A protein has these predicted regions:
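Interfacial helix-cap and linker-helix signal at transmembrane-aqueous boundaries
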Residues: 33-34, 65-66, 150-156, 241-242, ...
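Helix-breaking motifs and short loop linkers at transmembrane-helix boundaries and internal kinks
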Residues: 38, 70, 91-97, 125, ...
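Conserved MFS/SLC helix-loop-helix module at the cytosolic interface between two early adjacent transmembrane helices
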Residues: 57-93
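Cytoplasmic helix-loop-helix junction between adjacent transmembrane helices
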Residues: 101-138
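A late C-terminal transmembrane helix in Major Facilitator Superfamily
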Residues: 331-365
């Protein structure tokens, strides 16, 4: 790898790691927040939803900025914003303040994804992008493991507020990003070409033709399902484990680490299948696998079987996360790549984020089996949509889209 490639993958992996650490802080703090503020499960679920709404807003703004002013500047801005909002949670002692800060954190985190994926796509060969986006996504899982370890120590001794102080660490990353990363020649050429031919960078480019509109909306449905499954499971699985097995926060953190390891292994396998065979093959295997393995948790009644169930669920449900950035980056032109990645993924985050609220209601009104049936059905819907998208059938032989489809 070249020096810039090394810094690209290191910076994006670190950025996703710190972003995921912030998201998982909420997962582990959710039960203590409910207890300390005396709120319902539905109100607590809305905390995660506010984060995802912020991601939609931030993704829209920073996606456009990433295509207009450059990936590097935009990437550093997004990291700084979510770091500030996360650290400020230390001073939050009421639900409205928590909602506001999580929305602000979402703005920064939402902007980061598309810019990071664009950086990877523009600095590596097409045949490497699936694996490289998976490596960056694995960085996110490292952040989740660090969050689990931190939560197991900090929450019992210092309370949930103190956990969020670690959120200021990403500020350090912005220095290294601005100092060591440089824009790719592919981006600079595409930007110059767009300016020369007076092509505007706007959301309407994603809906320029009927086929492109169908592709964009279909990918949005898939990301909605991905985020609904991930946030729904990650925000509530620790609580489910604590309730079903009577585990403490510390022990449930160990269980979560096993789940996250499963996710990381899934990302490695997914990236390999995608680059070796095709995006369609990789997504087909993992979407069907996700729909099936969710029910394993119903039969898990010991610590060991819960760990194995968690690893399998993590392997399939989040193994494909990095694949979305790789697919979107190859289906849309370089000059709107950041916009496409951020808008599509963050529409998924905004709508899929409501799964935290919906699952809270399902858990309160029904049982775990109904909740798993709901999530399993979503994965099957995503599988059907993926089969209908013509872009997936062509993806193996089309390195990068240079023009919008007719």
């Amino acid at each position: 790898m070249t020096r810039n490639q090394k810094w690209t993958i290191a910076s994006t992996a670190a950025g996703f790691s710190l972003e995921n650490m912030d998201i998982m802080f909420l997962s582990f703090a959710l039960t203590p927040i409910i207890a300390s503020l005396h709120i319902s499960q539905g109100a607590a679920g809305l905390i995660g939803t506010m984060t995802n709404l912020g991601m939609l807003f931030g993704g829209a703004i920073f996606g456009l900025l990433g295509d207009k002013i450059g990936r590097i500047k935009t990437f550093s801005y997004t990291i700084f914003i979510f770091a500030f909002a996360t650290g400020a949670m230390f001073f939050a002692h009421s639900l409205p303040v928590i909602y506001a800060l999580r929305f602000l954190a979402g703005i920064g985190a939402g902007g980061e994804y598309g810019v990071g994926m664009a950086l990877i796509a523009e600095n590596f060969e097409t045949k490497q992008v699936g694996r490289m986006t998976s490596v960056a996504a694995i960085g996110g899982q490292v952040g989740a493991i660090l969050a689990a370890l931190a939560a197991s120590f900090i929450i019992p001794h210092f309370g949930w507020n103190a956990l969020f102080l670690l959120g200021i660490v990403p500020v350090i990353l912005t220095y290294f990003v601005r100092r060591h990363l440089t824009e790719s020649q592919e981006f600079l050429t595409a930007k110059e070409d767009a300016q020369k031919n007076h092509r505007k960078i706007s959301f309407t480019r994603l809906f320029a033709t009927p086929r492109l509109t169908f592709q964009t909306l279909g990918l949005m449905v898939m990301t909605i399902v991905q985020i609904a499954g991930y946030f729904g499971l990650m925000n509530w699985l620790p609580s489910i484990v604590q309730k079903q097995q009577g585990l403490s926060v510390s022990k449930s953190s160990i269980w979560m680490i096993a789940t996250i390891i499963g996710m990381s292994l899934g990302m490695v396998v997914f990236g390999y299948i995608m680059d070796k065979f095709s995006a369609k093959a990789a997504f087909s295997i993992f979407l069907i696998g996700s729909a099936c393995v969710l029910f394993i948790i119903l039969a898990a009644h010991t610590a060991l079987t819960m760990i194995l169930a968690g690893m399998l669920i993590g392997f399939f449900s989040n193994g494909m996360f990095g694949g979305y950035g790789a697919v979107i980056s190859r289906l849309y032109p370089t000059e709107i790549r950041s916009t496409a990645n951020n808008l599509i993924m963050n529409v998924g985050r905004a709508i899929g984020g409501f799964s935290s609220f919906i699952i809270g209601i399902l858990m309160q009104s029904f049982n775990l089996k109904v909740t798993m049936m709901f999530l399993s059905g979503l994965y099957l819907v995503s599988f059907i949509v993926m089969q209908l998208l013509p872009g997936f059938r062509q993806l193996k032989n089309v390195p990068t889209a240079k023009v919008e489809p007719e």
